[in-house]
Amino acid sequence: MVVNTEVNIGVLKLNNPVLVASGTFGYGDECKEMVELHKLGGIVTKSLSLNPRIGNPPPRIVETTGGMLNSIGLANIGVKKFIQDKLPFLKSIGTSVIVNIAASSVDEYCLVLSLLEEQEGIDGYEINISCPNVKDGGLSFGTNLSITVEITKRLRSLTTKPLIIKLTPNVTKISDFARAASDEGADAVAVINTLVGLAVDIRTRKPKLSTITGGLSGPAIKPVALAKVYEIARSVKISIIGIGGIMTAEDAIEFMLVGASAVQVGTANFIDPSTAVKVADGIVLYCTQNKIDSVQKLTGAMQY
């Protein structure tokens, strides 16, 4: 049996439902010798801001039980250098390219997106309003409902390409934020970004990260992420991209069963950059074994 692996995120058709998450795969060219990039459902780029950012001082990555803490601070090359140095390669790889945008003001989000709109080869945008690692951005946007509305509304007016709002789990009711994004024209939400976490070195009695707290990712957060996807799926009609601790095809299928149309592999890329391809292959195998002719039929198919 031939399994149809295509899924839709707004008007964007993905080859398969497995993308690589922002910040875990660079801009694609870093992994070209290790991964057959055309087999990915898509690449979500490292976050881009208007100007280059050096990020937070080290240490900014710490391994934890079942996961990883990071406090990178949105270090990136800036949008103009991305257009000049990275976008030409991304245009050539034969899979969808989604650019992740981060900013410290609503106007900056709009300016970055406007610059990207002038370029060919970009299939959609993921808007990072939820990064907990930067003191002057991220968290304040992602936990404020009215600002979420404003960002989505203004960016929607600037593009007809798929607009994906990446939500933080560090709020009381995440479905309110998903509904706000949906009401203002977002095509999808990406759920979840990292949880806030902290680790301490008991020998020095100092925090293990220079910024004290950071973003927790990896298998430890998967049950939380699944619950958030499930909550949102019961509240909105737009697509959901599930993120959080996906290491295997089984993990990805869980996200789809509770309502995700697609998934992103993140932390696992640091262990094995080809994880996303293996996850996509595993989803096809599961569908074949269960006589399911389209991966789209997995979305929301959890039995009660």
Place the predicted regions along the sequence by residue.
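Small/polar glycine-rich anion-binding or flexible loop at a beta-alpha turn
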Residues: I246-E250, D272, Y304
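Alpha/beta enzyme core
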Residues: E33, L37, S104-I241, M247-E254, ...
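Short gly/pro/ser/thr-enriched loop/turn and capping motifs at secondary-structure boundaries
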Residues: S49-I54, P132-V134, V196-A199, F270-D272
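C-terminal helical cap(s) of enzyme catalytic domains, especially alpha/beta-barrels
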Residues: G55-T65, V200-G214, M256, A268-D293
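A short, charged, Gly/Pro-tolerant segment at domain boundaries
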Residues: Q296-Y304
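N-terminal capping/small domains of soluble enzymes
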Residues: M1-V97, A102-A103
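Active-site metal-binding loops of divalent metal-dependent hydrolases
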Residues: G23-T24, G244-I246
